[in-house]
């Protein structure tokens, strides 16, 4: 088988709804030499991501799917800055100025990326504010900003804040005794401009409020106080509205949300490290606190506060992105799944069972006999189901004639059927070996956890070949047949299904 989001001298409930004049910095465009005909890899990715964003503006795409595409474009851009932009900044810091095959030096490349990315971010928020939110409101799906809250909703917000949010917040006044803290990568934070004197008689200044990751970024509004079938408020709006209650005796004259993106790459030398897993575990502890590469801040944040934040994160003007909305659009990604509106989503796709395999799923034939009579077999995913491959591992786990199972795992959650059946096979006394690629980017921690789970089940776990990344999907089942050992092999590409069904 083969598989292929405010300067307010007095706080008001008014929130901006348009970005107004462009706040993008002046960044010189970079033009490659005329005799260079190769596209720049990073600019090519940004062009691809622009096509993703275009789907969020495509009226032929179901509305909730358009929201999902907006979130995907945001997630893509985050990862792009964490890895690609971070790498370019490291080259510049290291004094590397040689042009690449596309004719651009690292600094020219960064200038071109910045110019494109600023325009892209502005388009993202125009898509959200001017297109998607109004269209969702027409479908009785509404995100309520502070200036739209009536008395009942304001009372509910206060109660929700007091009971579900305030207990986990730890406001921090910024002064010589309380310096600017280390903020984790992509976390939601608020910088507060205070006036007055605190309980200890100290003059006010700036304060910081961090929103823990455990808090949901979008909160559904109870239907008895909501004018829409599906009503939501942003966590940032709730915290912003209640900021005065957190600073006794002081007046928050400005509240501004921001997010910092950091270098998220892991640096492990294949030649020097003796234990790849232990080295990755050590690097993972530092991932959330890498060098800052981008600052996203509320569009109406005053320059003095932006400059203060820039100094804290050692960022230049071109690294600052003013946004007119929530600083992490990706946190809207669960909304489409929470709303039961099939008319606003793609129709569910059910892959077909290849005719070659239909008999094995009604218990009429052993899959090994079936495959041996028809091998080789080509399966075309996702149009054809992955079930035959899962069935092969399921039957192998309980077949007394199977002696060994060997499989590669790249991005596979602990709830995968493959993991379930491999553990069953090991407990049944079969020799099970799994190659886990620990360096599957942003899945390293999950894969380390998976490796521990498999080892606890008696499975031999290895971590691939030093210097290479194991991306192919391979499976070998060794079975005794008529006094011979026969191998059943599956080779493919893509990720393995991760859900129990």
Task: Label each residue range with its predicted role.
Residues 2-501:
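N-terminal localization/anchoring segments of enzymes in phospholipid and broader phosphate metabolism
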């Amino acid at each position: 088988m083969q598989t292929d989001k405010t300067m307010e001298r007095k706080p008001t409930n008014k929130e901006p709804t348009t970005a107004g004049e462009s706040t993008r910095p002046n960044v010189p465009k970079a033009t490659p030499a005329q005799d260079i005909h190769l596209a720049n890899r990073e600019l090519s990715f940004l062009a691809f991501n622009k096509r993703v964003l275009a789907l969020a503006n495509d009226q032929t795409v179901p509305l909730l799917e358009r929201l999902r595409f907006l979130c995907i474009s945001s997630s893509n851009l985050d990862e792009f800055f964490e890895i690609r932009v971070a790498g370019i900044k490291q080259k510049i810091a290291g004094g590397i100025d040689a042009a690449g095959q596309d004719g651009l030096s690292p600094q020219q490349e960064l200038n071109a990326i910045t110019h494109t990315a600023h325009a892209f971010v502005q388009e993202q928020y125009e898509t959200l504010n001017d297109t998607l939110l109004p269209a969702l409101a027409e479908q009785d799906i509404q995100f309520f900003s502070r200036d739209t809250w009536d008395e009942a909703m304001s009372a509910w917000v206060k109660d929700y804040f007091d009971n579900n949010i305030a207990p986990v917040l730890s406001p921090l006044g910024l002064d010589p005794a309380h310096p600017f803290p280390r903020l984790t990568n992509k976390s939601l934070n608020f910088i507060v401009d205070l006036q007055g004197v605190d309980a200890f008689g100290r003059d006010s200044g700036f304060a910081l409020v961090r929103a823990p990751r455990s808090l949901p970024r979008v909160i559904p509004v109870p239907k008895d106080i909501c004018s829409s079938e599906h009503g939501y408020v942003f966590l940032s709006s709730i915290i912003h509205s209640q900021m005065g209650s957190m600073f006794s005796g002081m007046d928050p004259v400005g509240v501004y949300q921001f997010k910092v993106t950091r270098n998220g790459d892991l640096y492990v030398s294949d030649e020097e490290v003796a234990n790849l897993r232990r080295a990755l575990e050590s690097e993972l502890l530092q991932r959330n606190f890498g060098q800052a590469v981008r600052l996203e801040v509320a569009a109406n944040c005053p320059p003095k506060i932006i400059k203060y934040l820039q100094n804290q994160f050692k960022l230049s003007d071109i690294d600052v992105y003013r946004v007119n909305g929530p600083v992490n659009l990706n946190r809207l990604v669960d909304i489409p799944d929470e709303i039961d509106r099939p008319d606003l989503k793609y129709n569910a796709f059910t892959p077909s069972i290849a005719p070659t395999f239909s008999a094995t799923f009604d218990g009429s034939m052993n899959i090994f006999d079936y495959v041996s009579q028809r091998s080789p077999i080509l399966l075309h995913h996702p149009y054809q189901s992955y079930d035959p491959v899962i069935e092969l591992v399921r039957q192998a786990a309980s077949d007394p004639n199977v002696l060994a199972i060997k499989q590669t795992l790249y991005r596979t959650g602990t709830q995968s059927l493959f993991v379930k059946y491999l553990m069953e096979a090991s407990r049944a006394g079969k020799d099970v070996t799994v190659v886990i690629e620990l360096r599957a980017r942003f899945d390293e921690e999950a894969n380390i956890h998976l490796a521990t789970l498999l080892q606890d089940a008696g499975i031999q776990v290895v971590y691939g070949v030093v210097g290479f990344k194991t991306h192919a999907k391979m499976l070998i089942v060794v079975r005794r047949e008529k006094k011979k050992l026969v191998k059943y092999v599956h080779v493919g590409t893509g990720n393995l299904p991760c859900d129990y069904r």
